[in-house]
């Protein structure tokens, strides 16, 4: 392997690893040291004979009344924050092991950390919050807590889980195998993008089968796989347009934009029109990224029946923090870096700027897709799931269609380009 390819592979792989681990680090810094229990562990503690454990609902009185939890004592977080001593607790909770729960498990974890600092307090946080509790057997088999779903919606749910999703996963594998021996940089990037996207979808399937879509870990792997997969695909599109259509990076080929520029940087000491347009697109994309950062977070979780089978629909707050906050802040940082490289680097600035731009576009596009479907269908998550899977099917199908339509030219090795763009690790 050439040194340039090894170096680029190191930076891309290192960036993916750092980008994947950063949310875990941020979560740890935010939540600090606390102990959490699963729904099963919490129920075992509560059901023990002479149990000294108590379930504490730290949501507001209004939220607790709207969606009550049997056996839970409502102790609102606003009051808990000023009552960190055993003597300040409600009498029914004194001397007991406390299991705190709220909508998402994040606020209860912070409160648990605060209460554990009080002498003699043993406090746990319910992992997953109400979303996990609603997925538990007691809530799932309480008819009054089941949201009705029409026959058409039940059919859509079945078609999504057993039709659309398996279809695009199988098609994705076929396209990956088709691209397996290709060495052109754009096709290699597309292959990696589809492979990482497929691994994310595998994590999604595991979350559905094993955890009933309540595992933040598997959902994070799903989200991260989609984001990185879209980034590689964006780079594949940019690289393919450059090398095969525009011919910007090929030093001996005539740039397709020369008719607009009249003079070309390849042949004269003039500013490059495409580079100047790129330097305007990047700041515009930064502005758009702030739309995600300003979007509100809405917790939603409910149980429903699908042809006699009880299932839980939820949009976890941890996932929304990734989609709306991380997928805006990280792209903003990458886009700023891309813009600075384009303005300040003298030798071949477009190639690294293009890589950084593609890295930013993936999570940004993923965040906007999630924002779009869950904003429209926030109260009917069956439709949100359907349109997300349908969009993913269109993504894979579009890649396959382009490869098939232009197969005679795409699978011919393109002319080498000048710069690292021709050195994408295979």
Short names for language-model regions:
Residues 172-180, 326-351, 404-406:
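Alpha-helical transmembrane segments in multipass membrane proteins, preferentially the mid-helix core
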Residues 213-226, 318, 379-392:
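Non-cytosolic membrane-interface motifs at loop->transmembrane helix junctions
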Residues 3-43, 53, 61-99, 103-148:
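Rhodanese-like catalytic fold shared by cysteine-dependent sulfurtransferases
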Residues 182-197, 274-284, 348-362, 414-417:
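Membrane-interfacial loop-to-transmembrane alpha-helix junctions, especially the N-terminal start
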Residues 148-171, 320-332:
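Hydrophobic transmembrane alpha-helical segments in integral membrane proteins
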Residues 189-210, 358-374:
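Hydrophobic alpha-helical transmembrane segments of multi-pass membrane proteins
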Residues 2-4, 243-278, 412-426:
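Membrane-interfacial, low-structure loops and terminal tails that flank and connect transmembrane helices
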Residues 203-216, 293-314, 368-380:
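Juxtamembrane "helix-exit" motif on the non-cytosolic side of transmembrane helices
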């Amino acid at each position: 392997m050439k040194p340039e390819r090894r170096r680029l592979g190191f930076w891309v792989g290192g960036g993916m690893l750092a980008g994947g681990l950063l949310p875990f680090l941020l979560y740890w810094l935010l939540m600090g040291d606390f102990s959490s229990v699963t729904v099963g562990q919490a129920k075992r503690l509560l059901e023990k004979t002479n149990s000294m454990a108590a379930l504490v609902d730290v949501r507001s009185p209004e939220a607790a009344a709207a969606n009550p939890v049997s056996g839970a004592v409502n102790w609102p977080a606003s009051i808990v924050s000023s009552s960190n001593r055993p003597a300040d607790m409600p009498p029914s909770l004194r001397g007991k092991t406390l299991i705190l729960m709220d909508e998402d498990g994040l606020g209860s974890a912070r409160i648990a950390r605060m209460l554990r600092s009080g002498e003699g307090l043993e406090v746990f946080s319910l992992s997953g919050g109400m979303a996990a509790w609603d997925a538990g057997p007691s809530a799932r088999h309480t008819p009054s807590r089941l949201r009705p779903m029409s026959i058409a919606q039940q059919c859509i749910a079945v078609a999504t889980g057993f039709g659309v999703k398996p279809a695009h996963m199988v098609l994705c594998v076929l396209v990956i195998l088709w691209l397996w021996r290709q060495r052109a940089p754009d096709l290699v990037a597309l292959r990696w993008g589809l492979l990482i996207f497929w691994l994310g979808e595998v994590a999604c399937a595991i979350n559905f089968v094993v955890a009933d879509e309540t595992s933040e870990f598997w959902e994070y792997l799903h989200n991260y796989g989609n984001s990185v997969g879209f980034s590689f695909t964006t780079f594949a599109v940019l690289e393919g347009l450059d090398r095969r259509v525009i011919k910007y990076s090929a030093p001996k080929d005539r740039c397709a934009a020369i008719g607009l520029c009249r003079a070309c940087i390849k042949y004269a000491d003039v500013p490059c029109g495409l580079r100047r347009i790129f330097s305007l697109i990047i700041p515009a994309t930064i502005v758009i990224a702030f739309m995600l950062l300003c979007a509100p977070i809405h917790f939603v979780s409910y149980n429903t029946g699908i042809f006699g089978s009880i299932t839980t629909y939820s949009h976890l707050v941890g996932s929304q923090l990734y989609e709306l906050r991380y997928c805006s802040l990280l792209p903003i940082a990458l886009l700023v870096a891309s813009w600075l490289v384009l303005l300040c680097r003298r030798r071949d600035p477009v190639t690294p700027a293009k890589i950084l731009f593609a890295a930013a576009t993936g999570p940004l596009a993923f965040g906007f897709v999630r924002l779009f479907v869950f904003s429209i269908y926030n109260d009917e998550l069956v439709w949100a799931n359907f349109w997300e899977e349908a969009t993913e099917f269109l993504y894979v199908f579009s890649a396959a269609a382009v490869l098939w339509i232009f197969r005679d030219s795409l699978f011919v090795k393109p002319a080498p380009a000048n710069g690292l763009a021709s050195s994408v690790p295979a």
